[in-house]
């Protein structure tokens, strides 16, 4: 039996098929009638199959809500949700339906799921399987921006730092700016932002990323800076400029980490670094 052309069947042929014992069995390609109806975005056929009992006879390897989430049109997703399918269900790959909406860039479908349950963006069998992390990996700034706008409270810092790590690693500056804007807006510790992966941007000599990072009050003292200051003049200048800014700013100059660090000692021992420091002080 081949159901791949079921969307072209006449009503009489379809009615005969639905009354047969094979109505909900897999065809020669391993798919059900519902699979082909969704693949063709055939809303009428989907409704007919649902009324005939398709959801009570799903194949083990088919996840209709996940499949429908890849469609640009949201009608079938709405119908399946109304029919009682669980939006938090994992498929055989450990993903939710929202994950596939993100993967396809379907913003309207993404909004449909998130409005129903914003926590879905953090559902996944592992942290790497969540829809939020997937959107970051895809560098989809629009979807991540929407996700952040729908979170009613702050979320796990470890998740945020993991996302910042992969963003810096991949050189996605706009995504990093979006995440740091959120991190800054929710920072209530009155301290410099701790970004462990600043060293990664330095090692990659990603000047554009570093320039973006240094627009924020980040902790530049968390990395071992001695070798960097001595090996790369351009990056050394950026670090020293930020250090001088912190020492001059009324908000940051009294922070312990600004007053007590090894940076001044490293600078004092090197003529070129001292000159950079003096020039930065004059400009500040």
Curated annotation (Swiss-Prot):
It comes from the Viruses. It is found in: Host cytoplasm; Host nucleus. Pfam families: Ank_2. Signal peptide: none annotated. Transmembrane segments: none annotated. Induction: Expressed in the early phase of the viral replicative cycle. ANK repeats lie at residues 29-58, 60-89, 93-122, 127-157, 159-188, 193-222. One of its GO terms (biological process) is symbiont-mediated suppression of host innate immune response. Keywords: ANK repeat, Early protein, Host cytoplasm, Host nucleus, Host-virus interaction, Inhibition of host innate immune response by virus, Inhibition of host NF-kappa-B by virus, Repeat, Viral immunoevasion. One of its GO terms (cellular component) is host cell cytoplasm. Inhibits antiviral activity induced by type I interferons. Does not block signal transduction of IFN, but is important to counter the host antiviral state induced by a pre-treatment with IFN. Plays a role in the inhibition of host NF-kappa-B activation by preventing the acetylation of the RELA/p65 subunit of NF-kappaB. Belongs to the orthopoxvirus OPG039 family. This is Interferon antagonist OPG040. It comes from Vaccinia virus (strain Western Reserve). The lineage of its organism: Viruses, Varidnaviria, Bamfordvirae, Nucleocytoviricota, Pokkesviricetes.
């Amino acid at each position: 039996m081949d159901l791949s052309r079921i969307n072209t069947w006449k009503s009489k042929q379809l009615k005969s098929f639905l009354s047969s014992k094979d109505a909900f069995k897999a065809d020669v390609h391993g798919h059900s009638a519902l699979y082909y109806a969704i693949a063709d975005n055939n809303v009428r056929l989907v409704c007919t199959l649902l009324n005939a009992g398709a959801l009570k006879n799903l194949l083990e390897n088919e996840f209709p809500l996940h499949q429908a989430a890849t469609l640009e049109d949201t009608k079938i997703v709405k119908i399946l949700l109304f029919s009682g399918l669980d939006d938090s269900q994992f498929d055989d790959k450990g993903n939710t339906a929202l994950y596939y909406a993100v993967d396809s860039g379907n913003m309207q479908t993404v909004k449909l799921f998130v409005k129903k349950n914003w926590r879905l963006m953090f559902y996944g069998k592992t942290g790497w399987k969540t829809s939020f992390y997937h959107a970051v990996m895809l560098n989809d700034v629009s979807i991540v921006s929407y996700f952040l706008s729908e979170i009613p409270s702050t979320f796990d810092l470890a998740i945020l730092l993991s996302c910042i790590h992969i963003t810096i690693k991949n050189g996605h500056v706009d995504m990093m700016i979006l995440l740091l804007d959120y991190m800054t807006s929710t920072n209530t510790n009155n301290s410099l932002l701790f970004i462990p992966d600043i060293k990664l941007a330095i090692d990659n000599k990603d000047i554009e990323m570093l320039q973006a990072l240094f627009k924020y009050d980040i902790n530049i003292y968390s990395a071992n800076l001695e070798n960097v200051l001595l090996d790369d003049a351009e990056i050394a200048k950026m670090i020293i400029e930020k250090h001088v800014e912190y020492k001059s700013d009324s908000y940051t100059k009294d922070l312990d980490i600004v007053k007590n660090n090894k940076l001044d000692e490293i600078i004092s021992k090197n003529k070129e670094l001292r000159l950079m420091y003096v020039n930065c002080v004059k400009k500040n």
